[in-house]
Structures are given as structure tokens and as C-alpha cells.
């Protein structure tokens, strides 16, 4: 029995609230159960130096956690003077995931930065950030389209979403919260497009290796979860 009493293939309650920032061109507050992430998409009409005069745009991401997003207060990384390795890994993952579904040529020489700030963490912050980040990116492109800068459907080729899966007490389960994630025998994150393409898979065994059969079960769970997330994204931006 899962601590949350959810079925093995049951996700937490998922919600997207658009337009939560009056300043950002695109924004979304995404909730995966008790994991809440504020995603904002900011437009700059310039690109990094190494992309100038290419005719192509760029999408990048940054990630952070508020000090009291966790059970005990975390020290701000800015106070330490540098970002931790985990933060750098996650924000690179978010950026890669979003770029996988963006046509940089259609975007033109502009950059969109998607900032993902964890307000409350209960497992799966990176998957929530990717999934909500897509909604914020869509809203930014919609803002640009209203000003005849781009066409959303030309720039954004597909949906992208992410979900965690793991083996908890010997059973493959979908969308782990912290109580499960902290003791799971296997923990994995799947990033996929709306058309079923795989962007990234991260999988780690804790103590006991997992079998190919178990990996297949996790993949099946992930696909069902991604399908549901994409449906919710479509409803959110409709």
C-alpha cells in the first residue's frame, strides 16, 4: 500500500493555473499534489553571443527552491555564492526538454528563459517544472503571437511533459511523492513528447538492481502518465 493510498498507476492531483505573474510574458503555477512550482517565461529580443546572426532563437531554463519549500529551511544558494550540482543538473534537464519541441528557426533571434521556482516540495519537482514550464512557454509564445512576432504552432512543435516512476515495496508505481521517493528501491524520471517521443530517461536503483521487465513496467506507467499530463496541458492552454 502506498503511503498516499493511491493505486499503483494513479497520479497525484494535477493542476495548471495560467497568468499568475503580471510581469512575465508567460506564467503558470503547476501543482503535482503538494509539489508546487511557479514557472515564468521571459522574452528577450536578443540571443546569446554564440547564436548571433544565425537567424535562430534559444530557449533556456533556470531552477531554484525557496528556503522553506522543504521540511526544514534550506540555505539560499545565492548566500553560498554558487549553485549546487543538483540545481545545475535539473535546470539543464528542463532546458533540454523544452528545446526538444521548439523550432528555433521559427522563433527567430530571440531568447525565452523559463524560470522554475519551487514553492513547496513533496517529490517530483523536476517533472512538475518541465510540465508546467511547457505551459508557461506556450503562454509566452501566445503573448508574442498577439503582437505578430511569431505563430505559436510554427514555433512549438509538440507538447513535452515529465513524470516520475519507481519501484516501491516491490511494486512499480507512478508519480512518487517524497514519502515514496525517499525509500523507493528504484527511482526514475521520464520526459516524453505528446507524440510519444522520448526526450530523456533517468533511472537509478538503490541497493537492488532492477530488471529489464521492471523497466518495461515503469515505461508503460510513464507513457500512461505522460498521456494524461498532455491532455491536461491541452485543457490548460485551450
Swiss-Prot record:
InterPro entries (alphabetical): ExoRNase_PH_dom1 (IPR001247), ExoRNase_PH_dom2 (IPR015847), ExoRNase_PH_dom2_sf (IPR036345), PNPase/RNase_PH_dom_sf (IPR027408), Ribosomal_Su5_D2-typ_SF (IPR020568), RNase_PH (IPR050080), RNase_PH_bac-type (IPR002381), RNase_PH_CS (IPR018336)
Origin organism lineage: Bacteria, Pseudomonadati, Pseudomonadota, Alphaproteobacteria, Hyphomicrobiales
Superkingdom: Bacteria
EC numbers, comma separated: 2.7.7.56
Name of the protein in question: Ribonuclease PH
Provenance organism: Brucella canis (strain ATCC 23365 / NCTC 10854 / RM-666)
Any one GO molecular function term: tRNA binding
Amino-acid positions noted as binding phosphate in the UniProt annotation, renumbered to this chain: 86, 124-126
Reaction(s) this enzyme catalyzes, per UniProt: tRNA(n+1) + phosphate = tRNA(n) + a ribonucleoside 5'-diphosphate
Amino acid at each position: 500500500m502506498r503511503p498516499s493510498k493511491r493505486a499503483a498507476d494513479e497520479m497525484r492531483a494535477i493542476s495548471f493555473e495560467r497568468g499568475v505573474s503580471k510581469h512575465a510574458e508567460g506564467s503558470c503555477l503547476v501543482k503535482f499534489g503538494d509539489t508546487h512550482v511557479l514557472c515564468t517565461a521571459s522574452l528577450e529580443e536578443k540571443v546569446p553571443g554564440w547564436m548571433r546572426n544565425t537567424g535562430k532563437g534559444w530557449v533556456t531554463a533556470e531552477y531554484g527552491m525557496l528556503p522553506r519549500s522543504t521540511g526544514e529551511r534550506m540555505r539560499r544558494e545565492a548566500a553560498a555564492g554558487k549553485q549546487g550540482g543538483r540545481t545545475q543538473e535539473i535546470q539543464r534537464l528542463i532546458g533540454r526538454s523544452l528545446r526538444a519541441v521548439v523550432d528555433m528557426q521559427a522563433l527567430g533571434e530571440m531568447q525565452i528563459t523559463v524560470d522554475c521556482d519551487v514553492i513547496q516540495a513533496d517529490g517530483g519537482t523536476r517533472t512538475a517544472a518541465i510540465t508546467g514550464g511547457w505551459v508557461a512557454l506556450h503562454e509566452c509564445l501566445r503573448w508574442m503571437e498577439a503582437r505578430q512576432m511569431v505563430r505559436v504552432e510554427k514555433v512549438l512543435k509538440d507538447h513535452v511533459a515529465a513524470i516520475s516512476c519507481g519501484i516501491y515495496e516491490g511494486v512499480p508505481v507512478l508519480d512518487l511523492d517524497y514519502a515514496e521517493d525517499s525509500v523507493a528501491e528504484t527511482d526514475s524520471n521520464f520526459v516524453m513528447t505528446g507524440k510519444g517521443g522520448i526526450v530523456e530517461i533517468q533511472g537509478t536503483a538503490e541497493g537492488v538492481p532492477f530488471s529489464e521487465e521492471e523497466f518495461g513496467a515503469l515505461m508503460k506507467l510513464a507513457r500512461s502518465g505522460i498521456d494524461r499530463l498532455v491532455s491536461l496541458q491541452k485543457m490548460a492552454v485551450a
